[in-house]
């Protein structure tokens, strides 16, 4: 599924988003990963923009897919399909190369430069060394606020039940437009849902949670 995400509670651990992102990137069949500093990227990787200090129109939480990667000694160029319309003029003002507009997406090329100790004290030059996006096969539930996907898979290990407040759970299960799958044990489900029932505030959100869980159970 192209528009799909795994939502995680933590960054680290077996079920953390770092490990899950690595798993899905390794499963990406588009050749070897390109290594840049501490980063690894492949063509076809799902990404989320997370730094808009350099680019006005590549805003925080903008979704994209890497189409091409061109690496040189002093720079790396990414061709990316971003899920928003950016005009050619807007790209020019952001110093991004406009390539095409395809199905409500814009194909762009941006360049990240190698770290240069002689220039990094200059704020504008320092911004050009930052990769402004992260891998996004898996995303933290907190980061997913405001995002929507056709398919959402939520991973809830039994060791993290104390972190699942009603608000966190509500955020996770309402990110989907079509399909929701929750990976948890029956004991974990019971502990979490019974905890929600003891909370007296947020009746509307509790009803939405119950309805979502009924739909998920019915479709599984």
Language-model-derived ranges and their functions:
Residues 1-220:
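Core RecA-like ATPase module of SF1/SF2 helicases and allied nucleic-acid translocases
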């Amino acid at each position: 599924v192209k528009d799909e995400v795994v939502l995680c509670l933590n960054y680290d651990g077996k079920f953390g988003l770092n490990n899950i992102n690595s798993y899905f990137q390794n499963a990406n069949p588009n050749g070897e990963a390109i290594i840049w500093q501490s980063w690894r990227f492949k063509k076809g990787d799902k990404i989320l923009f997370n730094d808009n200090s350099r680019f006005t129109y590549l805003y925080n939480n903008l979704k994209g897919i890497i189409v091409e990667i061109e690496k040189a000694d002093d720079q790396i160029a990414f061709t990316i399909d971003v899920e928003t319309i950016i005009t050619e003029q807007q790209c020019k003002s952001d110093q991004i190369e406009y390539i095409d507009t395809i199905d409500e997406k814009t194909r762009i090329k941006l360049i990240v430069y190698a770290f240069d100790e002689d220039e990094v004290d200059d704020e504008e030059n320092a911004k050009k060394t930052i990769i402004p996006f992260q891998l996004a096969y898996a995303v933290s539930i907190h980061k997913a606020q405001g995002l929507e996907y056709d398919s959402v898979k939520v991973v809830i290990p039994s060791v993290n039940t104390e972190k699942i407040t009603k608000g966190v759970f509500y955020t996770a299960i309402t990110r989907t437009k079509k399909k929701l799958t929750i990976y948890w044990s029956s004991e974990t489900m019971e502990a979490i849902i019974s905890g929600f029932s003891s909370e007296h505030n947020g009746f509307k959100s509790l009803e939405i949670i119950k309805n979502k869980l009924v739909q998920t159970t019915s479709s599984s």
